[in-house]
């Protein structure tokens, strides 16, 4: 089966990951002790995408948890599904990375990385046909960003032909958790551009906005935010885990969404977003889902898709519906909003349909868009980076761990190149490209 090995790094990654395993276990009818209590054979049919059957019929996640300090791990272990994980798969240091990318990537992280890779190797060896890896981490801290990207590059060396998908929490525009976020994020993006296949961009502020607007809790907790993210992670892989009419997997997703190798940073969204209390009162239709899914307010990262154009997009529907209706809606979206889609990639929405909806809903949809508007996010981080780097503020923390200023300069220019690549394709028209083709033919 097409297994996926899940890796969570740092505090943020572990908290999102813990929530994700609650959602997935619930979908497959697995209780916190690792026993199956489901009511349908479909839950078991492909349960081994994310789970492994251990001795004594215990079902265990194919998960690897790592951090440079024990705190978050302890709370995951003490959490509702803490007993589900294999005890050997918790790998942690004692010193912490102290929000310092260099500590995570070069010093503290490098000491721990071999024991992490051992666990990854064991999990990968336990798979029949490994599809790839998914990593949850944040880019603002030290461990998730520094050690997370170190692990990604090591896995890349070892498994070059497997898909590497990350769920990366970017620094938010208005709220900042740490002062050195711009440094950590820029150094991480520098790595992700080269070593990841698909990066789903998330940010806390956008998640807060979604929570306030639609889910209407009085004060959204991180638990609520992480729940939103888990819904998307679950949606992305639902076709692998349940039967469907139009299947998709991580590789199909990459092939359909990435027109140029460096442009693999995606916006994600989910529908229906209704508050927990009012779920049962709303009947949903495919047009409603589509409209909500493409709504700019539903994007889980702080970029407005209306400020750019979609190169490609993917819509994954779950629930009982006709594929004909899905196709009509996708066509409808492209025709009505044609100015928001580049004209030189015709029919640029991939859709897939999985028959089994998530718990508590009749139907749902997950949206993944490759939009040029994502450059707003990179621009914002780059500006903050430049402001500090020009004065060499806080640099001694990084150079003290053995980093070189040159690496900062390279990361900065890589990020700026990425922004201008997005801009170039946003401005490109079908006609221009055509002219170049004619010239080439004439040369022959």
From Swiss-Prot:
Similarity comment: Belongs to the tubulin family.
Function text: Tubulin is the major constituent of microtubules, a cylinder consisting of laterally associated linear protofilaments composed of alpha- and beta-tubulin heterodimers. Microtubules grow by the addition of GTP-tubulin dimers to the microtubule end, where a stabilizing cap forms. Below the cap, tubulin dimers are in GDP-bound state, owing to GTPase activity of alpha-tubulin.
Protein location: Cytoplasm, Cytoskeleton
Protein name stated in the entry: Tubulin beta chain
Cofactor needs: Mg(2+)
PANTHER family reported for this sequence: TUBULIN
GO molecular function, a single term: GTPase activity
Binding site for GTP: 11, 69, 138, 142-144, 204, 226
CDD domains: beta_tubulin (cd02187)
UniProt main location, coarse: cytoplasm
Keywords, comma-separated and alphabetical: Cytoplasm, Cytoskeleton, GTP-binding, Magnesium, Metal-binding, Microtubule, Nucleotide-binding
Gene3D superfamilies on file: Helix hairpin bin (1.10.287.600), Tubulin/FtsZ, C-terminal domain (3.30.1330.20), Tubulin/FtsZ, GTPase domain (3.40.50.1440)
Annotated residues for binding of Mg(2+): 69
GO biological process annotation, one example: microtubule-based process
Subunit-structure text: Dimer of alpha and beta chains. A typical microtubule is a hollow water-filled tube with an outer diameter of 25 nm and an inner diameter of 15 nM. Alpha-beta heterodimers associate head-to-tail to form protofilaments running lengthwise along the microtubule wall with the beta-tubulin subunit facing the microtubule plus end conferring a structural polarity. Microtubules usually have 13 protofilaments but different protofilament numbers can be found in some organisms and specialized cells.
UniProt lineage: Eukaryota, Sar, Alveolata, Ciliophora, Intramacronucleata
Record field: compositional bias (Acidic residues): 429-444
Signal sequence, renumbered to the chain: none
Annotated spans, Disordered: 423-444
Source organism superkingdom: Eukaryota
GO cellular component, one term: microtubule
């Amino acid at each position: 089966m097409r297994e996926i090995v899940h890796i969570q790094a740092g505090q943020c990654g572990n908290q999102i990951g813990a929530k994700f395993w609650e959602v997935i276990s619930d979908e497959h009818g697995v209780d916190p002790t690792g026993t199956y209590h489901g009511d349908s054979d479909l839950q078991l049919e492909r349960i081994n995408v994310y789970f492994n059957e251990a001795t004594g019929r215990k079902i265990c996640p194919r998960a690897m948890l790592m951090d440079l300090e024990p705190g978050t791990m302890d709370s995951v272990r003490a959490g509702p599904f803490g007993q589900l994980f294999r005890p050997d798969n918790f790998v942690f240091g004692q010193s912490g990375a102290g929000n310092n990318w260099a500590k995570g990537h070069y010093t503290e992280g490098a000491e721990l990385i071999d024991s992490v890779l051992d666990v990854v190797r064991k999990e990968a060896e336990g798979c029949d046909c490994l599809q790839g890896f998914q990593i949850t981490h944040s880019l603002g801290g030290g461990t998730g960003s520094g050690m997370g990207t170190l692990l990604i590059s090591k896995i890349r060396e070892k498994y070059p032909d497997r898909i590497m998908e990350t769920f990366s929490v970017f620094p938010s525009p208005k709220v900042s958790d740490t002062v050195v976020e711009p440094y950590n994020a820029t150094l991480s993006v520098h790595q992700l551009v080269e070593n990841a296949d698909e990066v789903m961009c998330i940010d806390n502020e956008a998640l807060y906005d979604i929570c306030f607007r639609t889910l209407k809790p009085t004060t959204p907790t991180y638990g609520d935010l992480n729940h939103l993210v888990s819904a998307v992670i679950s949606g992305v892989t639902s076709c692998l885990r349940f039967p469907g009419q139009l299947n998709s997997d991580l590789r199909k997703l990459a092939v359909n969404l990435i027109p140029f190798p460096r442009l693999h940073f995606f916006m994600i969204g989910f529908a229906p977003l209704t508050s927990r209390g009012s779920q049962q009162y709303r009947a949903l239709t495919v047009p409603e889902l589509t409209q909500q899914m493409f709504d700019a307010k539903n994007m889980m990262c702080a970029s407005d898709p209306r400020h750019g154009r979609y190169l490609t997009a993917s819509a994954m529907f779950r629930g009982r519906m006709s594929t004909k209706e899905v196709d009509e809606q996708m066509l409808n979206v492209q025709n009505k909003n044609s100015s928001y889609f580049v004209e030189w990639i015709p029919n640029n929405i991939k859709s897939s349909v999985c028959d089994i909806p998530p718990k508590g809903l009749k139907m749902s949809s997950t949206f993944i868009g490759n939009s040029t508007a994502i450059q707003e996010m990179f621009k914002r981080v780059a500006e903050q980076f430049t402001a500090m780097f020009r004065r060499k503020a806080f640099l001694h923390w990084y150079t003290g761990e053995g980093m070189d200023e040159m690496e900062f300069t390279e990361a900065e220019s890589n990020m700026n190149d990425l922004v201008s690549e997005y801009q170039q394709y946003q401005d490109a028209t079908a006609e221009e490209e055509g002219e170049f083709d004619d010239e080439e033919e004439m040369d022959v």
